[in-house]
A protein has these predicted regions:
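Long, charged N-terminal interaction/targeting segments
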Residues: 1-65
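Short, flexible, mixed-charge glycine/proline-rich loop motifs
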Residues: 61-69, 82-87
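Cys/His-enriched microdomains
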Residues: 71, 91, 109
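Short cysteine-rich clusters marking metal-coordination/redox-active sites
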Residues: 73-76, 93-96
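Short functional micro-motifs and their immediate structural scaffolds
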Residues: 79-82, 98-102
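Short Cys/His-rich "knuckle" micro-motifs
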Residues: 83-86, 103-107
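Charged phosphate-binding loop/patch that engages nucleotide di/tri-phosphates or the phosphate backbone
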Residues: 113
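Compositionally biased, charge-rich low-complexity tracts
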Residues: 118-123
């Protein structure tokens, strides 16, 4: 349920941009989400459809791009893709066997691209 306030903020950012650009509508939005955010993508999509109703983003296509978690091994300093879930869950560094990591990337959450349709002048 923590997705709803996040989606509201994302929509606000997009609407502010569209207003500044004098857009008639928002056609698509690409959202980059680091895997460490632990957002449920189905809820992000569902809530976006809900909160965008009645706005110029109501017909926008929401593109969700997942970004991997990149960590540095605290022992050997190698960079690895860290997996949080499933059979590939990372517990040890594949290079040295180290068990402690520093996260470098994977916590991101940002609007990467907004495609708008501009208003025609004078109409």
């Amino acid at each position: 349920m923590h997705e709803l306030p996040i989606v509201k903020q994302i929509l606000n950012v997009c609407l502010q941009y569209a207003e500044k650009e004098e857009a008639e509508s928002i056609k698509s939005i690409r959202l980059c989400i680091g895997e460490a955010n632990d957002l449920i993508l189905e809820y992000v999509d569902k809530y976006f459809k809900y909160v965008s109703r009645g706005t110029i983003a109501s017909e926008a296509k929401l593109e969700l791009e997942m970004l991997p978690i990149i960590c540095e091994c605290n022992t050997c300093k190698e960079h690895i893709i860290y997996h949080l879930k499933g059979d590939e869950r990372t517990t040890n560094c594949p290079f040295c066997g180290g068990e402690e990591f520093t996260m470098l990337n994977g916590g991101e959450l940002f609007v990467d691209k907004i495609e708008i349709e501009k208003k025609e002048n004078g109409i």
